[in-house]
UniProtKB/Swiss-Prot annotation:
InterPro entries: Arg_repress, Arg_repress_C, Arg_repress_C_sf, Arg_repress_DNA-bd, WH-like_DNA-bd_sf, WH_DNA-bd_sf. Belongs to the ArgR family. Pathway: Amino-acid biosynthesis; L-arginine biosynthesis [regulation]. Its main location: cytoplasm. The gene is argR. It comes from Lactobacillus delbrueckii subsp. bulgaricus (strain ATCC 11842 / DSM 20081 / BCRC 10696 / JCM 1002 / NBRC 13953 / NCIMB 11778 / NCTC 12712 / WDCM 00102 / Lb 14). This is Arginine repressor. GO terms for biological process: L-arginine biosynthetic process; protein complex oligomerization; regulation of arginine biosynthetic process.
Amino acid sequence: MNYKERRQLIYELIQTNKIETQEQLLLLLQAHGANATQATISRDIRALHISKVPDDDGRSYYVKAPSAAVNRERQLKDAIRERVATVTAVQFTVVIQTSMKLTYAPILAGLIDDIDNDDVVGTIAGTDTLLVILKDAEAAASFADWAQAIVKERKIY
């Protein structure tokens, strides 16, 4: 079994079993015909971005880390919730005004550029204003509605 097959098997095993230790993982791999050392398993775990998370009983199990795409979308939502003052759709664009006069619009533009959204054509950022260019007016309205809903989630103390 080559390393790609072994790593695929590791993913399958952690999704179907509650594995607490590398030793347990090694035994399961061996039961499935994969011969590896503990050092190899440790490298595979790092390479696959597998981490341990506690369950309700306080025991920790290996799990597949959230994908980068999920993390980027969460970062974008957090940024919109915390830093955006207004969102306005104008034809096939969305104008976003940040709530801080600090150069936050370029950061927000980078987050938008990084998400996997086929409707977003590109972004242009100034200091506190961001222009999101979308493929059409319908996509712009949808994006604006999505962003406005996130802004409304902001808690005011």
